[in-house]
Amino acid sequence: MVDIIHRIGIKASPTEVYAALSTVDGVAGWWTRETTGESKVGGVITVRFLDHGVDRQGPVTEKGRMDLEVIRLEPGKEVRWRVKAGPQEWINTDVTFSLSPADGRTVLVFGHRNWREAVESTAHCSMKWATFLLSLRELVETGSGRPAPDDMKIDNWN
């Protein structure tokens, strides 16, 4: 099994960071604006990534979609999702956000765990997760993140 792991500091309390991770509106503020569902244990959150065409002209097409079952919500400490639908290599992987206070900020340890193997898309997703974690930090620290479709583009896949 392969894991993607990142660590980031955020100038906010664990409670504030948790709010951005544990609600549909919070996730829509840093990952993708196209976020729907129920943010409760046993609920499913759906995230969609849309292509609006060159310069936002032309037809809108769906580039990606994931259904995430909410496995754990521990206020101020942890959020855990299990991928139930999406790209084949994502199915049954776990996405984890562990929060702890440190030196007047929150340290977030992120994991996208249990990939069956390291493939090219693992590298792409690792880099994209890093950009979305920076978006999360911007959202919590400034009130405005960079969710898709306004996220940082890193390669020809997005």
Question: What positions do the PLM features span?
Answer:
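A short, structured loop/turn motif at beta-sheet edges
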Residues: P14-T15, E38-S39, I71-K77, S98-V107
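Helix-adjacent hinge/juxtasegments
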Residues: V54-P75, V79-A85
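Terminal, regulation- and interaction-focused segments at domain boundaries
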Residues: M1-P14
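Short beta-edge strand/loop motif at the mouth of beta-sheet-based domains
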Residues: I5, E16, D25-R65, P149-D151, ...
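A short N-terminal helical cap/helix-turn-helix that marks the beginning
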Residues: G143-G145
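Hydrophobic pocket/interface hotspot
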Residues: V17-L21, V27, I45, V70, ...
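Hydrophobic/aromatic beta-strand elements that line small-molecule binding cavities or substrate pockets
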Residues: H6-I8, M66-R72, T93-S100
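Beta-strand/loop substructures that line and gate deep hydrophobic ligand-binding cavities in soluble
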Residues: K84-L136, P147
